[in-house]
Amino acid sequence: MMENWPKKPEGSQWTDDQWKAVVANGRDILVAAAAGSGKTAVLVERIIKKIINEENPVDVDRLLVVTFTNAAAQEMKNRIGEALEKVLIDEPGSQHVRKQLSLLNKASISTIHSFCLQVIRGYYYMLDVDPRFRIANQTENELLKEEVLDDILEEEYGIEDNTIFFELVDRYTSDRSDDDLQRMILALHTESRAHPNPEKWLDKLVEAYDVEGKTIEDLVYASYLLEDVKFQLETAEQHIRKATELAMLPDGPAPRVETLQADLALLGTLSSAARESWTSVYEAMQNVSWQTLKRIKKSDYNEDIVKQVDSLRNKAKDEVKKLQEELFSRRPESFLRDFQDMHPVLEKLVQLVKVFTGRFQAMKRDKGMVDFTDLEHFCLQILSEQSEDGEMKPSAVALQYRNKFAEVLVDEYQDTNFVQESIIKFVTKDSESEGNLFMVGDVKQSIYRFRLAEPGLFLGKYKRFTQEGLGGGMKIDLAKNFRSRHEVLAGTNFIFKQIMGEEVGEIDYDADAELKLGASYPEGEDVAAELLCIQQTEEEVIDGEEGAEVEKAQLEARLMAQRIKAMVDSGYEVYDRKTDSMRPVQYRDFVILLRSMPWAPQIMEELKLQGIPVYADLATGYFEATEVNIMMNVFRVIDNPMQDIPLAAVLRSPIVGLNDEELATLRAHGKKGSFYEVMSSFLKGAPLEEEKELHDKLEWFYNLLQGWREFARQQSLSDLIWKVYGETGYYDFVGGLPAGKQRQANLRVLYDRARQYEATSFRGLFRFLRFIERILERGDDMGTARALGEQEDVVRIMTIHKSKGLEFPVVFVAGLGRRFNTQDLMKRFLLHKDFGFGSQFIDPRKRIKYTTLSQLAIKRKMKMELIAEEMRVLYVALTRAKEKLILIGTVKDANKEMEKWLDAREHSEWLLPDHIRAGASCYLDWIAPSLYRHRDSEMLLELGQGSIPDEIYGYDTSWKVEVVDGNTLLAPEPVQEEKQELLEALREKKAVPLESERKEEVYDRLMWKYGYEEATSHRAKQSVTEIKRNYQSEEGSDNAFIKKLRAPIRTRPRFMEKKGLTYAERGTAVHAVMQHVDLKKPVTVEVLQEQIAGMVNKELLTFEQAEEIAIEKVISFFDSDLGKRVLAAKSVEREVPFTMMLAAEEAYQDWQGESGESILVQGVIDCMIEEEDGITLIDFKTDTIEGKFPGGFDQAKPILEVRYKVQLSLYAKALEKSLQHPVKEKCLYFFDGNHVIKVEE
């Protein structure tokens, strides 16, 4: 069949594997697309090829394209639309292509949840759901769960003779609460919903504990743990073999060899038993007896080698001892008794889960709401039916979808779960060898297991499919990376060839998995990857684990700040693809990646102290923001004014403005009773003269409070919030404070949160406050409102998960010495998709508890899955870098850690030993041992190549490996003693005796005159608009322009002035619409109204600005000849920022300084279009023309042309410099009157 596929066009940019992925057909296809391999482009091209296929074209609505996010779906649609429009340019008469463009908006290109929603909306009558259902808010969902669970448990507690339930409570709850039991029920419910048949999965949990008539050999847990026993015995054998090699060295302790050989024989016996059965190992473990080491005279042998030999032998013995204590200290039948004893308790637990699921579903149904797991299960319910043997098979609806979809394409397939896989299976053909399923993903980037994604689905098909597709599915590897420099790729490959394998890591990092260079970069300086290992400071300044973490974060932040400043200040260059040239690095080119965000605030603080602009999208801190805290206290007081702390906080806040003395005076009027009662009593009496001001403040607030309380009983919560904002003036007040925009954004988020809350099934201020409290109790604080644009020139801090799919020129991966989060392994109960439920055996009567076989097996399985997931997270982090990769980690004792890491140097194979990889507790435990086997670490180690093979030691990668002393990072700047004394004297306003040698210096400083006086009256940095005004100015004095720009003195603060959009604000709003209007859609009133509403939702426009937009004027532009040219242009760029150097005499007409001086000019070009014959520059103007010029536009035209000529000339100059192409035409477009002026030089 392969010869029927279209051949790759000559001169095509596609690689052979990419082309194969574009055109391969006739079977299920799995594309393993490495990071930066262009998978989205391949996916789009495949869709386009199917749509415009000459022999058998497929309508776009006969394709189901499943993406991971809504943003990805929209991007996919946009790319397909752009590609179809290009085809239409070449084939303007093609009705088929026009039809596809019209079908595109209706096409099934969406997330799996959107597809499920589409199915449910179409076939809701097959389900017991209200067709008007809504998607539940996450917090509302959690509150409903708690409500349902509380009711169920209350009923259970009220049942007499409920013996098994109370046994369950005794075993899994504390004396104080049954929170642990609730957590178990909710966890089992959540895990079960990740399976196509939740009840069946729950039943299997119970069946696993029914061991009647079984031996330990029949248990899946024992079979799995035996594999772990073999693994640990093999590790012990490796230690003994290594010890034997050392003992046999010329100056090694040769008398130890005989004992070590006996140890190997003992371990061999245990390993043989492990290959037989659990019982065999148990019996062998009871007979373990280690020989006593023969005494030797240590002075006869190399002392270091003797120590190494004895240490390795002790490690081996510890491995066996651990097995004896954990697994073989109890007889096999006692493990079976655990299962028998726990079986009825687990049965009751599962029954509670089923009752909970039923009640929870019923409550959601009554409230007309569904959650995201419901979407999947309802869709699956519609697409499946039960066969005679009890298995699921496609329903009639599923068969309709099978007939409809010519192909199903799944992006990010590695993040699919079992339920989603079942849905996909029911709408695609059964046979893999004749299938129509196309899957794209990279299992090495599967990092969402915590969301119940199942990378095993991808891995199973990758192992099963072949590259030829013979007899089954086909797999295609896209290994070429078009993102990164060779140094980044080679560095990543070097690490992962050593740490990622099937046994530990779930994936073989073989030749097919390796990243291959696909990008072309100019030669760069200092592009080697780096590992900077910080030795923590020895000073015991900070106690405790939390304090140590703070210090580590500060050390790493200080080092990163130094590196960033050095790179920016030195003009470190990165490649700019748009201009195809190297340019100086900017702050926006840097990203700091962290596994999680606890360190982010400290890192931000340190970078800010160093003068580095930085941004992190923190998931906490919202409710801690002062303005939010104050408002929440206002609402608490409205709900219940008898609460002293919230009321005192409001009275002390800027809203009322009492000081400490006034608050004390109020309390003195009534030492008993609440603050509210005292305030009411105080206001009833006649105030003393000195208390008049206090009385007025309280009376004003008291009256407002009564009005709010009445309003809250009758009106909506969101209206109440806005009323409070307005009547207190607090919203305007915070706008006038530092970071005012951020503060106002935070208050708007509170308002929006209230509106979202009112869209749920809950109502009222009291429930809203409880709703917020539950959010905080669960630690679900939100981040502060976003007040930063994507293009801001700042260093970004984000989690590795957030960075997936992104790329940055310079990447710092920090916190590599932080321990992996293993808290899930420490829980009282464990859940696993395959092994079910595991917990300690707890006997409340005897007050004993001990580990069970199921708990040990699940813990081991989860640990290995965690290790594999962390490897994939590290892979994602390293592959974000385009040009420079810098890895940073902190250790407490570098010498001790290096001694541990150096064990890897004795290993001669690429893949490090399993025990090193599985025993890692942080990323450095993988990275450092890998790099210590490379020649570039020799500057640090000075150990030579030793036994490391040439292909590893001399691998083609460049690294800088360095240990940094933390003391040098935290050392304060030296201060001269003399200078310090002078400062102290000045602070105390003492006369300072002037030494004779200082007299001349003081005189020179006092009499000094600046040599560039001219430059002080002219700015070194100007905007184009300011230069335009300068040219218009008729005043001739040197300082006239600058004086003219000074803000006028206002009689009232701006935030207290009466609001109303200025001409400038209206102009800004129009420009915002012109920037964001979708040129791919028809420009109609309805479309524009929808887009403007979307801009308001995204906070790109305010409500007031949106109301001021004259939509008909925007449409008039696009109906004009110039507007039609914009719609038809090859490319359109809008709101293009630029910076350029300009001779001072060009910017300032009055310049009299040196002729070589330059100034920095900044501006933003409204619109530039590229047409076949060149570039046209367009500037939009909202000047009022009609009625302002008696002679109409004819009189206005020459005036306006002169007014804006300089501005457009500078824009054109900037474009010509950056694009290296002349600007053929410069146009002014005036919305008032729909006028166009072509500006000539």
Swiss-Prot record:
It comes from the Bacteria. Residues 12-485 form the UvrD-like helicase ATP-binding domain. Its cofactor is Mg(2+). ATP binds at residues 33-40. Coiled coil: none annotated. It holds the Pfam family UvrD_C. One of its GO terms (biological process) is double-strand break repair via homologous recombination. One of its GO terms (cellular component) is DNA helicase complex. GO terms for molecular function: 3'-5' DNA helicase activity; 3'-5' exonuclease activity; ATP binding; ATP hydrolysis activity; double-stranded DNA binding. It catalyses: Couples ATP hydrolysis with the unwinding of duplex DNA by translocating in the 3'-5' direction; ATP + H2O = ADP + phosphate + H(+). CDD domains: SF1_C_UvrD. The keyword ATP-binding applies. Its EC number is 3.1.-.-, 5.6.2.4. Belongs to the helicase family. AddA subfamily. NCBIfam families: addA_Gpos (TIGR02785). Heterodimer of AddA and AddB/RexB. The heterodimer acts as both an ATP-dependent DNA helicase and an ATP-dependent, dual-direction single-stranded exonuclease. Recognizes the chi site generating a DNA molecule suitable for the initiation of homologous recombination. The AddA nuclease domain is required for chi fragment generation; this subunit has the helicase and 3' -> 5' nuclease activities. HAMAP family: AddA. This is ATP-dependent helicase/nuclease subunit A. The gene is addA.
